[in-house]
Amino acid sequence: IFGGTVGVSLLALYQQGDGLRAQNYQLILFESAALFFFFLIFQKWKRPFLLLVPALVCLVLINHAANGKAGNLVQKEDYQEITDSAWQDAVRDALDGETGLCRTEQSGVAKKRKDNVNRIWNMRQWTTSVYSSAYDTEYQNFRNNVFQVEQPFRNGLMQSASANPLFQKFMGVKYVIGRSEDGENFTTEVQETAAPVIYGTSQILSEKTYQTMEFPYNQTMLMQYAVTDEENIAEHGVTKTKGIQETNVTFTAKHGVTKEDDSWKIRTKKNQKSTLSLDEDTSGKERILYLQFDVENEHPNRDVSIVINGIRNKLTAKSHLYYNGNTTFTYVMKLSADQKKVNVTLGKGTYRICNLKSYVSDTTVLEDDSLYQSTFTPDWNATKGNQISGSIEMEQDGYLITSIPYDSHLEIKVDGREVVTEKVNTAFVGCRMVSGEHWVTITYHAPGLSAGKWISLAGILLWAGMWLLTRKFSRAEKNL
């Protein structure tokens, strides 16, 4: 046991390499040596407490060092804030008057988003976040590689609510619930032009054309068109998002930032406050800043994180079990009128920021809702469990578009007849629809559900049969 513990500890220490983890594994080595010492004493005195007491002491010390001291334990005040039932009241109040299908999320910094990644307060609260080993690969790929939302956490499977206003609009996040600055009251930000979760449109773009769109058009074009794999689409009227202009930005800090040609070299032993300056004339109106760059980590076994305007991106150490592979950091944010500087926190480490792309535009792309020509109206009496039902009036032939991740077990019926489902917007379920008024039902058939029910029934019958046979044999033995 001692040899195995030491071997694993040394291997982990070699692979991790950074200071905090090195201290933790040194503690494990010390624990192993101490336990081995008391084991030798036990061999002579044969007193159980010689093994039990040192083991308990080591467990407490290691837990304090690895969790408590590192800040991994949830504080009582934080837990009370996270689970405060007042959040439930705020979400309910926001959804009480809502008749459509939309999403509702909680705002906050990365830590708050992490706390609420799988949390809902109401059965009608739909979110964009998920943290599960049984994740949808299409949706995961869309977030990370197609739309390229920020990735604030070490674990690549932890997909939290995004601060990207374009992603929020695309996914139908209509309500964002938060706390006021004094922390006393709740605030509800209503995004009236957010996409319906289900809608009809004839503004179609082929996936082949969409795949040629580079940042930031890979995001903005999804506000103007629905993407399908139909190749025979007349795209002569398709135009790129207007009003997006390239701009120059500069990172400045007191220490640790060096400009090198078209890149910035970061070398800092602790988090460094910095400023991102925009080289442009402000319009006196709100704007959107689109920012993307690659991160070259010179110490790949250490994490790198950069926070810009409260939005965090993190590149995990390659040795991490759930390495996120986030080598391209993307930020999309709204700027207030006349704002030319953005606060930045450069995480500790040695790395290079390169291949930087920066653009600005007005907020028209957020305000335009012409894509959503026909809105789906849910029937809340028929919408429950694994089924969504409602009506839609298509103004012209086109597609039924949803922001429900595509799955082969999803079934769509239009006017009672099953139709062929298609993958739309590269990762979501949809289908073709003709003009007119229709009744739509979307049903999810869980794979293995029927087989599971039959197996459970067979198990119950077998158990009942065994119970009856046992009683019969018991009575027969008593009669002998």
Predicted features, each with a name:
Residues 245-480:
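Active-site-proximal, structured, solvent-exposed surfaces of multi-pass membrane proteins
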Residues 1-84, 435-480:
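Contiguous transmembrane helix-bundle modules in multi-pass membrane proteins
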